[in-house]
């Protein structure tokens, strides 16, 4: 087993600073790389305002409102309502309920 001590971009490093190309990556690193400066800055900025807000109708956040407007402006006119969910499971369950109600 190789103990990882740090990672940057597409590479991981062991305790001896030996560099390995990361073919496994993980959930977020696979698309943006390890320690991506833009992601670090966005996380830092967001964490200074709030970490998490439930957005199931009780509260809204500016980023979710902006995304909903962007989606509505770029989809067919009859697709103008957005409902954000917490996970793929909730999204799938919601889409099944909508399909059942529609048919």
Question: What is each model feature region?
Answer:
Residues 1-8, 49-50, 64:
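Active-site-adjacent loop/helix segments that line or gate small-molecule/cofactor pockets in enzymes
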Residues 2-23:
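Active-site and channel-lining beta-strand-loop segments
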Residues 19-103:
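Glycine-rich loop-to-alpha-helix module at the N-terminal edge of alpha/beta enzyme cores
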